Amino acid sequence: MKSLVLKAAAWLSDLRVAIVLLLLIAACSGLGTAIPQGEPAAFYHERYDAAPWLGVVNGNQLLSWELDHLYTSNWFLLLLAWLGLALLLCSLRRQWPALRASLRWLDYTKPRQLSKLAVATSLDTGDSAAALDQLERQLQQQGWAVRRQQNRLAARRGVIGRVGPLLVHTGLIVFMVGAVVGAFGGQRLERFLAPGRSLELLNPQGDTRLELQLDSFAIQRDPAGRPEQFSSQLLLRDGTGAPAQPAAVSVNHPLRHRGITVYQADWGLAAVTMQLGQSPLLQLPLQTFPELGEQVWGLVLPTRPDGSDPVLLALQSELGPVEVYGADSQQLGLLTVGGESQEILGLPLRIADVMPASGLLIKRDPGVPLVYAGFAITLLGGGLSLIATRQLWAISESGRLHIAGLCNRNLVAFADELPKLGSSAITGAPHDAR
């Protein structure tokens, strides 16, 4: 039984297994990008039953495979746990022992031991003890840690590079933990707010965590009328009775406040202010009409007191114009925002104003600090991994200086430098062993 556990641990800690898992998780994450996430089941049936995804996967299959919430699906979390376990075992079985071994001083006492190392050389010297002293001074000047004994020395440099792989594994594990915490503990809310309206965000106890009030909303358009930027001026209240704090949010410039991030995600039209005949100004809510286009808002308005002869008012921008259609789908007229009234089926209509609405995306993700920390640790570990760890041993014996060394990076360059280092120790000339 013990041997089976050890074999399983050895297989799980294999670097090739971790690489395959990383590629598989990356491919699955691509699926989550291609397939909309978190929509109602009816959305997937409507979209993929008639036209299956990639011509194969219909709505039922997509839902049964949990592709509608891929990042919190059981099989995706299992892949993350598997990768985390593989990295943990690899760190414990390989990286940690390698780090501990690099911190131990190895004492080679005989030249024959040095000759078996990856890089070794032996040089004639008139005074091997003096050459060893000179070599010690050179190594210390170049930043090597040196341990000297009577007729031999050991030196090392760049040991911190051994910490790099361990930090990379730790960072990836922290990153995955943060992703899981965010997937289960995070909250996401999309709302359209009209100016003057507010939205309360409650904590788990039902108390007001944050109140957002839209003070104003502006849409910047290019000469062709296409929206280029839209921004919201908000008032923030934290539920403690403190004065409201003004804040701004726009596209690519989110607002972060007490663990909550507010994005400017969309825009819409909330209401139209109009006059019917000699009536006072009336503010009527608008609704979307997807069957007329992607961004078309409007309302159905009766033109008679008994509710008969309705007309459809449709518009695509807060700037207008407002198109008026009859029950037979024929256009009856165009109304200018802020312009003069026009008679439609005997009823004078005037559009005074159109109120835009701000589409806000509100996220709370408790896993973000862990994700950022994981990225930082991984980057630090990757940088440290580039530092070459070099070890060197030298023994003076019978007029000869025996030098050998090990290096985990660019061994060829180290093999070229080692004889030069020994020669400079013999002649007393300085040599920069990088």
Curated annotation (Swiss-Prot):
Name the membrane topology term. Multi-pass membrane protein
A Pfam entry, by short name: ResB
Sorted alphabetically, the Gene Ontology BP terms of this entry are:
cytochrome complex assembly
> Which keywords does UniProt give here?
Cytochrome c-type biogenesis, Membrane, Thylakoid, Transmembrane, Transmembrane helix
Gene Ontology cellular-component annotations: plasma membrane-derived thylakoid membrane
Subcellular location per the Swiss-Prot or TrEMBL entry: Cellular thylakoid membrane
- Which segments cross the bilayer? 15-35, 73-93, 163-183
The record's listing under HAMAP family reads: CytC_Ccs1
Q: How does it assemble?
A: May interact with CcsA.
Family recorded in the similarity comment: Belongs to the Ccs1/CcsB family.
Its job: Required during biogenesis of c-type cytochromes (cytochrome c6 and cytochrome f) at the step of heme attachment.
Name by which UniProt lists this protein: Cytochrome c biogenesis protein CcsB
Organism name = Synechococcus sp. (strain RCC307)
Q: What is the lineage of its organism?
A: Bacteria, Bacillati, Cyanobacteriota, Cyanophyceae, Synechococcales
